[in-house]
């Protein structure tokens, strides 16, 4: 038995027939010696952040941010590419997404929710950090260092200039990871104790906030439209590029069934000396896959596949598997030369933003 109680706090105010139905279900489960689970969900007035279940069960449930496809119903835009940009800005945190107005453009949402005086989400990043840590300055510095995209330990250390040794970064990264604000990844071909790790902000909205909104809070000169045009627009594609690869990895993990016949049972990336592969893993069918992601630039012709082949040869991940799929994820319509090169190979595919979003490509 699984009982899901949405807005569980209303149960005590409900009519007796509601509590009677719940009681009868529990009695039946107990009589039949069945395992039963009770899942409760309740509205919170907190503007953003982790929601803790207060009750007698003694459990805490941390809900991850929504994936790109799961967040689509809340994102403004008219094309798949628009939706990728919107996800790169507002991410997948439900308490953020509920404030987004789908009837206006992404730029208008950015101004209204993040840049205008008393904007609803302007202090969201502060609220998340400052209720869990007493001295947030270095935590802000770490998150700001990661806001420009996934990076390594040394780069994070350089972003916190008052720390004299790289080892001093550890407690801040570990605390942020424990709070669910930072994620750590290893290359799929690395051992569990490998120090070759990369760190990223856990949700695109938090990265966007630390990259663009926090500096605005510290310097409010100029109006919101000027800041949007001068500070955000020129760097928005760079920011979205960092998010696009994660969207591609999400697709392989959760939504590849309709294209490749199964989702990935292992999904991540590969990097090392002489190779960098944005999306890689093993499908449920046992086939290995390797893909690179192109948001800003358009891949051209067969040389794009050749470069991917060379990167695959530089590591042994998936070596010996009967089928090894090459994938090119592109945010723009692929040129004819690339389509021809892919069509000549049985183990190569092109995935556009429409497929990632579960709709027709542009």
Predicted features and spans:
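Walker B catalytic acidic pair
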Residues: 6-8
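Conserved nucleotide-binding/hydrolysis micro-motifs of P-loop NTPases
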Residues: 10, 43-48, 66-69, 94, ...
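Sensor-1/coupling segment of RecA-like P-loop NTPase cores
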Residues: 10-53
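N-terminal positioning helix adjacent to the helix-turn-helix/winged-helix DNA-binding module
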Residues: 53, 82, 134-138
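Conserved small helical "lid"/interfacial subdomain of P-loop NTPases
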Residues: 59-84
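The conserved phosphate-sensing helix
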Residues: 80-99
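Accessory nucleic acid-recognition modules appended to NTPase machines
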Residues: 102, 108-276
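A cross-kingdom feature that marks ATP-driven nucleic-acid transaction machinery
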Residues: 202-362
């Amino acid at each position: 038995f699984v009982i899901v109680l949405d807005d569980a706090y209303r149960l005590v105010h409900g009519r007796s027939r509601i509590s009677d139905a719940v009681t009868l279900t529990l009695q039946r489960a107990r009589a039949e010696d069945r395992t039963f689970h009770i899942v409760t969900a309740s509205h919170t007035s907190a503007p953003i952040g982790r929601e803790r279940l207060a009750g007698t069960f003694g459990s805490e449930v941390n809900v991850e941010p929504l994936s790109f496809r799961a967040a689509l119903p809340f994102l403004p835009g008219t094309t798949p590419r628009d939706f990728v940009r919107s996800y790169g800005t507002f991410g997948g945190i439900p308490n953020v997404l509920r404030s987004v107005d789908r009837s206006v453009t992404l730029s208008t949402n950015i101004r209204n929710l993040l840049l205008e005086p008393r904007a609803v989400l302007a202090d969201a990043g502060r609220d998340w950090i400052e209720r869990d840590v007493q001295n947030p300055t270095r935590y802000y510095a770490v998150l700001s260092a990661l806001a420009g995209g996934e990076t390594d330990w040394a780069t994070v250390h350089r972003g916190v200039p008052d720390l004299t040794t790289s080892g001093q970064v550890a407690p801040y990264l570990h605390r942020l990871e424990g709070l669910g604000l930072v994620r750590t990844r290893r290359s799929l071909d690395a051992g569990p104790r490998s120090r070759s790790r990369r760190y990223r902000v856990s949700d695109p909205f938090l990265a966007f906030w630390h990259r663009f909104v926090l500096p605005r809070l510290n310097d409010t000169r100029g109006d919101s439209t000027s800041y949007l045009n001068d500070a955000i627009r020129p760097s928005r594609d760079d920011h979205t590029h960092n998010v696009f690869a994660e969207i591609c990895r999400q697709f392989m993990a959760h939504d590849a069934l309709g294209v490749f016949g199964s989702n990935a049972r292992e999904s991540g990336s590969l990097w090392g000396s002489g190779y960098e592969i944005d999306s890689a893993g093993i499908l449920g069918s046992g086939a290995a896959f390797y893909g690179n992601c192109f948001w800003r630039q358009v891949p051209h012709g067969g040389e794009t596949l050749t470069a991917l082949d060379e990167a695959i040869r530089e590591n042994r991940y998936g070596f010996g598997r009967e089928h090894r799929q090459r994938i090119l994820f592109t945010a723009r319509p692929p040129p004819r030369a690339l389509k021809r090169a892919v069509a000549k190979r049985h183990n190569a595919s092109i995935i556009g933003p429409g497929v990632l979003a579960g709709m027709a490509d542009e």
